[in-house]
Amino acid sequence: MSEHHSGFVAIIGRPNVGKSTFMNRILGEKIAIMSPKAQTTRNKINGIYTTPDAQIVFVDTPGIHKPKNELDTYMDKAALSTLNQVDAILFMVEADEEKGPGDGYIMRQLAEVKKPVYLIINKIDLVKPDDLLPLIESYQHDYAFAQVFPISATMENNVDELLTALTDALPVGPQYYPEDQLTDHPEYFVVGELIREKILELTRDEVPHAVAVQVERMKDREGGKLQIEAYIIVERDSQKGIIIGRGGQMLKQIGIRARRDIENLLGDKVNLKLWVRVQKNWRDNNAYLKSLGYNTKDLR
């Protein structure tokens, strides 16, 4: 009987390189929200991948970028604080983007960490094979990576090979979570993220970064349905109007799409009620950020 391996693996990189898509593909379920808009992930989100021989807990971190407000500061600290708490690190970049200052900043942070770091070049389906080697060499010039894996998270190219390498590299250890558990976050957190994803999909560019979702209540199932009540938080009355839409149509569409994903995730019929609340400048209000679950003082 082979030894069982287990451990924690951080996924780090600039905003919008495909970290959440990668983790969702591996798990076969949507637990981290995806959007073409940058800075979608705000918290560290743990996804649990289990096989008979291993259990890998992937930590999907917020994209690292120059902070513009207290929320951005929280997101950067959340990502960087993960590095010393895991067994291995996946540094994800895009195959169709040249190495930039943001990548250099991340690699300087990685230089302080005594963990194996794997360079993951995502979206290889968007470039010609001959274009990959110069990109790989440019990254290897600046950092001694444990291994390099060109992958396509959407097409699942080379993902199995990466999982095998990670399994072999992780220490011998127990299975931390039941085999059917996909995340250690509570249901209300994942539900809030799925609602926020639909807002990102449907609203204009001026709204997404100013939006938060607070799930107030998930009641026991009544009449065969799970009752969920949530507030969508925005900073301005104009943003509230955009999210509600003419005759309430935008809010209705957000609810319809979110309910569909929530039902798929939880396996239950859902009655979802949404309201929109204006909280001016909430992204720079530490007390309000804490009430939403963001607390930079907890990050060291």
From Swiss-Prot:
The entry's keywords: Cell membrane, Cytoplasm, GTP-binding, Membrane, Nucleotide-binding, Ribosome biogenesis, RNA-binding, rRNA-binding
Chief place of localization: cytoplasm
Sites where the protein binds GTP: 13-20, 60-64, 122-125
Gene3D superfamilies on file: 3.30.300.20, P-loop containing nucleotide triphosphate hydrolases
Residues in Era-type G domain copies: 5-172
Annotated spans, G4: 122-125
Region of interest (G3), residue spans: 60-63
One BP annotation, GO: ribosomal small subunit assembly
GO molecular function: GTP binding; GTPase activity; ribosomal small subunit binding; small ribosomal subunit rRNA binding
Membrane topology: Peripheral membrane protein
A cellular-component GO term for this protein: cytosol
Domain (KH type-2): residue spans on this chain: 203-280
Region (G1): 13-20
Compartment(s) of residence: Cytoplasm; Cell membrane
Region feature G5, mapped onto this chain: 151-153
Domain of life: Bacteria
Region (G2): 39-43
Known role: An essential GTPase that binds both GDP and GTP, with rapid nucleotide exchange. Plays a role in 16S rRNA processing and 30S ribosomal subunit biogenesis and possibly also in cell cycle regulation and energy metabolism.
Assembly information from the UniProt record: Monomer.
Protein family (similarity comment): Belongs to the TRAFAC class TrmE-Era-EngA-EngB-Septin-like GTPase superfamily. Era GTPase family.
Record protein name field: GTPase Era
Gene designation per UniProt: era
